[in-house]
């Protein structure tokens, strides 16, 4: 259900009638009390910890009815009628919204609780006196109409009396009609039956025609069905055709496994092998069925009890595989291993070997006293405007562990044309959670001043100095132009970015200089990253 302010705006724009009855304001089939609060915030409230106040429906409706008056006259008249006044800063904005000149207003609080209007019945009921007057009216009957009704009823009764069968008048059919006339009537009845009733013979003829039609179509449809292929997609392949879902899944897994493994190496024909006469090929022995008396084929050498041990051999310089395979395997020379082509799916890197990320990383201080924090990092680096962290907290922004900003820049094409592209940058304030391989992607760090900011970092000197860190990562320091520079920052290789307290139009050049400095550094030292 819409709020009362939106309903009032709709009625005001469409010039609909707003009915004020007692302490209620009626909008068609809905009504609200006069003192109901809207979601329009009173100017000057809701700041510095003060609770928000909202204009009532009565005060806004009184403003619409007296919009032609000047503000002082309107204030005096509202005070006379004891109605809250719409303040002067809100007057123009509120009237613009109610008249349809603006689609919304900054003073409208969408999170304010809505007052539900009462629904009124739209059925129009007659008054009790009208009902009584209607009941007291005498019913005038036309004598002519009554006479006609009586005549019509008498004629109907007379016709019914004539239609009564009298037994004295019943005669035999042979007495009333001749034999030829009776035969003619029977012939007509039979002809009518043949034309309206379908016999069993007709059913047999129709079924025979349909069967011949189906037989003629079988040959045509058989050829079509033989060339049909079932269309399989990611969705249909997961839909089981039977009650047992495992049959479909196992069949898919077997086909995927067979495709991944490819053909076995021994089944692949050697590409450079010379053609061999089929008559010279030795047939592979076919394993016979199990026979409990066929123990002789498991019998080996008597002296070694079938363990294929060469008593005249030596184990010097041999591997375990050559020992287990026996002497015959040691004597045969193993051919040089040919490179076996791998399937296309195996040529890809395994899933655990992911391709390294090329997204640059920017580290900012985790302290709340820093000018750049996780609350306003996107405003500073992406939108190029400075918004204090305290203001972001008042807006209800939540702090995140890391954020991804999209930097917009112009990139030159080979033809000399420039196109606008966006480049992602990862911003973090907890560098100790970075993986060892992530430090190669760290391109910039915002320095706050104290050296303990770099505790636990790589490349930190034993005395705690971050000089080597600044040799590998570009460092920046953000401060107000009226604040004195930190002594540690003066000693370090840090680019200082100064912001004005009040001149917000100077923020964009400062952050553009940050990106230009970072681009020059990345071209020289981090050219493998995406920027």
UniProtKB/Swiss-Prot annotation:
Modification Phosphoserine, positions: 212
Tissues with expression: Found in adrenal and parathyroid glands, kidney and heart.
InterPro entries assigned to the protein according to its UniProt record, in alphabetical order: Cdc73/Parafibromin, CDC73_C, CDC73_C_sf, Cdc73_N
Record-listed N-acetylalanine modification sites: 2
Record function comment: Tumor suppressor probably involved in transcriptional and post-transcriptional control pathways. May be involved in cell cycle progression through the regulation of cyclin D1/PRAD1 expression. Component of the PAF1 complex (PAF1C) which has multiple functions during transcription by RNA polymerase II and is implicated in regulation of development and maintenance of embryonic stem cell pluripotency.
Region described as Interaction with CTNNB1: 200-250
Motif Nuclear localization signal boundaries: 125-139
Effect seen on changing residue 95 to P: In HRPT1; uncertain significance; found as somatic mutation in a parathyroid adenoma sample from a patient who also carries a germline frameshift mutation
A Gene Ontology cellular-component term: nucleoplasm
GO BP, sorted A to Z: cellular response to lipopolysaccharide; endodermal cell fate commitment; mRNA 3'-end processing; negative regulation of apoptotic process; negative regulation of cell population proliferation; negative regulation of epithelial cell proliferation; negative regulation of fibroblast proliferation; negative regulation of G1/S transition of mitotic cell cycle
Subunit note: Component of the PAF1 complex, which consists of CDC73, PAF1, LEO1, CTR9, RTF1 and SKIC8. The PAF1 complex interacts with PHF5A. Within the PAF1 complex interacts directly with PHF5A. Interacts with POLR2A, CPSF1, CPSF4, CSTF2, KMT2A/MLL1 and CTNNB1. Interacts with a Set1-like complex that has histone methyltransferase activity and methylates histone H3. Found in a complex with BCL9L or BCL9, CDC73, CTNNB1 and PYGO1 indicative for the participation in a nuclear Wnt signaling complex. Interacts with PTPN11. Interacts with SETD5. (Microbial infection) The PAF1 complex interacts with Zika virus French Polynesia 10087PF/2013 non-structural protein 5/NS5. The interaction with viral NS5 proteins may reduce the antiviral immune response by inhibiting the recruitment of the PAF1 complex to interferon-stimulated genes, thus preventing their transcription.
Region: Interaction with POLR2A and PAF1, residue numbers: 200-531
Cross-link (Glycyl lysine isopeptide (Lys-Gly) (interchain with G-Cter in SUMO2)): 198, 301, 308, 321
Disease with which this protein is associated in UniProt: Hyperparathyroidism 1: An autosomal dominant disorder characterized by hypercalcemia, elevated parathyroid hormone (PTH) levels, and uniglandular or multiglandular parathyroid hyperplasia, adenomas, and carcinomas.
Comp. bias regions, Pro residues: 338-352
Region described as Disordered: spans on this chain: 260-292, 325-358
GO molecular function, one term: RNA polymerase II complex binding
Superkingdom of the organism of origin: Eukaryota
Entry PTM: Phosphorylated. Dephosphorylated by PTPN11.
Keywords recorded for this protein, A-Z: Acetylation, Cell cycle, Disease variant, Isopeptide bond, Nucleus, Phosphoprotein, Transcription, Transcription regulation, Tumor suppressor, Ubl conjugation, Wnt signaling pathway
Name of the protein in its database record: Parafibromin
Lineage, broadest ranks: Eukaryota, Metazoa, Chordata, Craniata, Vertebrata
Protein's cellular compartments: Nucleus
Family designation: Belongs to the CDC73 family.
């Amino acid at each position: 259900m819409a709020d009362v302010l939106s309903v009032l705006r709709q009625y005001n724009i469409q010039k609909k009638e707003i009915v004020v009855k007692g302490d209620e304001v009626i909008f068609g089939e809905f009504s609200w009390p006069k003192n109901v609060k809207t979601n329009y915030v009173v100017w000057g409230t809701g700041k510095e910890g003060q609770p928000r106040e909202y204009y009532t429906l009565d005060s806004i409706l009184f403003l619409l009815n007296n919009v032609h008056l000047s503000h002082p006259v309107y204030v005096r008249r509202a005070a006379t009628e004891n109605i809250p006044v719409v303040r002067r800063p809100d007057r123009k904005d509120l009237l613009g919204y109610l008249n349809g000149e603006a689609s919304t207003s900054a003073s409208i609080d969408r999170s304010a609780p809505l007052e539900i209007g009462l629904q009124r019945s739209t059925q129009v009921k007659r008054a009790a006196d009208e009902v009584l007057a209607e009941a007291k009216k005498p019913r005038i009957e036309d004598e002519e109409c009554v006479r006609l009704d009586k005549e019509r009823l008498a004629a109907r009764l007379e016709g019914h009396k004539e239609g009564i069968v009298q037994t004295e008048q019943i005669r035999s059919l042979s007495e009333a009609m001749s034999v030829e006339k009776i035969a003619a009537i029977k012939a007509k009845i039979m002809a009518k039956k043949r034309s309206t009733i379908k016999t069993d013979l007709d059913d047999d003829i129709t079924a025979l025609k349909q069967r011949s039609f189906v037989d003629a179509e079988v040959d045509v449809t058989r050829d079509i069905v033989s060339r049909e292929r079932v269309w399989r997609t990611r969705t249909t392949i997961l839909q089981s055709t039977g009650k047992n879902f495992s049959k479909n899944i196992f069949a898919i897994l077997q086909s995927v496994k067979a495709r991944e493994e490819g053909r076995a190496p021994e089944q692949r024909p050697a590409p450079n092998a010379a053609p061999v006469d089929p008559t010279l090929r030795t047939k592979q022995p076919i394993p016979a069925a199990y026979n409990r008396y066929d123990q002789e084929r498991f019998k080996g050498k008597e002296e070694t009890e079938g363990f294929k041990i060469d008593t005249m051999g030596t184990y010097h310089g041999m591997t375990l595989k050559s020992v287990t395979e026996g002497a015959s395997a040691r004597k045969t020379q193993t051919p040089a291993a040919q490179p076996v082509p791998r399937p296309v799916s195996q040529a890809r890197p395994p899933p655990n070997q992911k391709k390294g990320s090329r997204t640059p990383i920017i580290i900012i201080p985790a302290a709340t006293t820093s000018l750049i924090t996780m609350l306003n990092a996107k405003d500073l680096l992406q939108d190029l405007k400075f918004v204090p962290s305290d203001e972001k907290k008042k807006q209800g922004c939540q702090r995140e562990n890391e954020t991804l900003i999209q930097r917009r820049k112009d990139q030159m094409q080979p033809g000399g044309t420039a196109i606008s592209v966006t480049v992602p940058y990862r911003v973090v304030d907890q560098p100790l959670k970075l993986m060892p391989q992530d430090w190669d992607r760290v391109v910039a760090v915002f320095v706050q001043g104290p050296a303990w900011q770099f505790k636990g970092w790589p490349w930190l000197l034993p005395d705690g100095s971050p000089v080597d860190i600044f040799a590998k990562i570009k460092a920046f320091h953000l401060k107000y132009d009226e604040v004195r520079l930190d002594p540690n920052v003066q000693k370090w290789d840090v680019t200082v970015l100064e912001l004005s307290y009040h001149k917000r139009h100077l923020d964009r050049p400062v952050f553009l200089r940050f990106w230009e400095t970072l681009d020059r550094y990345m071209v020289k030292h981090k050219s493998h990253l995406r920027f």
